[in-house]
Amino acid sequence: MMSPAQDKLQHQHHNPNSSSSSSSKMTNVYQVTTPKSPQDLENNMDEPFKMDTATSNPDKDSENTQRLKYECAKGEIQNVLNLHIMLNHKHVRHLRRNVQKVNAKLALLETLHKDTGLLNKIERTYQLKIKQHQQHSVLGGHFHDSTATENTNASNYNLSYPVLSDYNINCQPLSSSSNRNLSTTRIPHHHYHTRSKSNGLLLEPSALRPANSNIIDYRLTGSKSLSEAITKPTPVSLPHSNSDGISSPRSSSISPLDEQPGFQILPFKPSQMHLNHRRNYSSTCLTSNSGIIGKTENNEPIFRRYDGILVIITCSKCDRSGFTSAQGIVNHTRLKHSKLYSSQPLAVLNNQKLLPNDKQDPEILSKFKKLNLDPNKDYLPSDIAIPKPQSPINHSENHTRAPKTVKNTPHLEKLYQNKEDFKKLIDMVNETPDDLNEYLKQREIQLRYQKEQEEESSKSDDEASYVPSPSLSATATTTTTTDPPSPPVLSSSLQRKLLRKRKLSLNSSTPMEDLPLRERLRANPTDKKPRKAALLTNELEGPDPAAKSSSYYNLRSKSRLRGSHT
């Protein structure tokens, strides 16, 4: 390969005439040179670089890019495969763990099924827990219950703690001996009646024990421990009919309702009513002194009214019973029969069935007889049915009568040179509570006296006779007489406002008694709006032509508008 310069020299060597001719032509042509633009200079600078790249091999670049793409794709695919494998291994391990748990449960069920004395062992563990609880209570300071609680036998345990069959009705032991005695198993009676009708998950034992009435009773009585409730029952004499039909009082202690069938009434205590409203509890509240206290032979709840009468809440329209609260019958009548009652006691009074007199409290019945009231139609007055609490004045007097402890003040005593002055100061400080009590008593007496005076003044003002203006019919010759017009009936709030005006107008020149009725009932001229009393009197007596509205505040009058423009 020859360069272009060598080709040119060779061409000139072979054709010398051509070069001379070309040179002759060049002499005849004028060349005009101009400076190059910056773009041409940059292009000239880049030419060797472009030439180098052009001379390089393009096949090597394509191979490198393809190799890089292959490596990237390979790494991404490997990462996805590793993640998928890890997830599959984790899922497999989880399944194996669940299989092991199920196998362990099956093995446990097989061992329990083979064990014939399983129930006895469970009862022993419960008894052991009871003894541990008793020992803990004795160590905690309950020494008075230790002698009684150490003798707790299996019968007492059965009253307080349910056995395995109490957890679920359908949860029976797997042994053949227990299947033979299915008819003899005791079905537990739940204290709370729920609305749930679902039968799912019957084979799984519940984590919560059913509410035993014995435990609930000792909670209601306020005892600190279960042993105290068992060893110290609260006897209550209640009428009970024997087999002969003769009513005899029986003692009722705290015992489960499901173990004593028949008519039962628990001892009434206001603290057991509305346990979820303990903060709002008040002994004078009507709803706090009423509630469910037992059940009848037909397992119907017995409702105690606030006056002590025992009833069964029964709807008067559909004869539905079993309501455990007064609000229940209110909701039932409102939703089912579109009947609204203004209060719960009124709803109970109209939807009730009284128990027989032998099951009622004779003292309460005697109160009804004294007042000639019918329990089916009336309630006892609240002041008779509910005893009033003691006045808090006695408590304050007891507090004031408590012995006072005089504190020593040695530092203050050192500052006093005269000991007699220091003793007088101490005596004065000790006597300040007595002086304060006397001052408060005098203040109460003054306030009562002022209230009595205000009541007397209001009564005297109300009893003031109404003197109407003489009618024109009196001067007429006719014998017919017309009755004086009745004064307008005013509300109590308007009467109080009028009394205040009378007291404020005592300092005026003319007394209020000398003014006519229209002036007395007229509103104060400083008020922006007329009073109701003035409107009533104006309607009765007619408009007054002499009374004209003042034009002082009439800003739209023509004279004022003209004066403002000028």
Swiss-Prot record:
The keyword Nucleus applies. Residues 1-65, 231-256, 384-411, 449-566 are annotated as: Disordered. GO terms for cellular component: ADA complex; cytoplasm; nucleus. Residues 241-255, 467-496 have a biased composition (Low complexity). The keyword Transcription applies. Keywords: Cytoplasm, Nucleus, Phosphoprotein, Transcription, Transcription regulation. The modification Phosphoserine is found at residues 282, 505. GO terms for biological process: chromatin remodeling; regulation of transcription by RNA polymerase II; replication-born double-strand break repair via sister chromatid exchange. Residues 25-42 have a biased composition (Polar residues). Residues 449-462, 515-528 have a biased composition (Basic and acidic residues). It is found in: Cytoplasm; Nucleus. Residues 557-566 have a biased composition (Basic residues). Functions as a component of the transcription regulatory histone acetylation (HAT) complex ADA. ADA preferentially acetylates nucleosomal histones H3 (at 'Lys-14' and 'Lys-18') and H2B. AHC1 is required for the overall structural integrity of the ADA complex. Present with 339 molecules/cell in log phase SD medium. Component of the 0.8 MDa ADA complex, which at least consists of ADA2, ADA3, AHC1 and GCN5. This is Protein AHC1. It comes from Saccharomyces cerevisiae (strain ATCC 204508 / S288c) (Baker's yeast). The lineage of its organism: Eukaryota, Fungi, Dikarya, Ascomycota, Saccharomycotina.
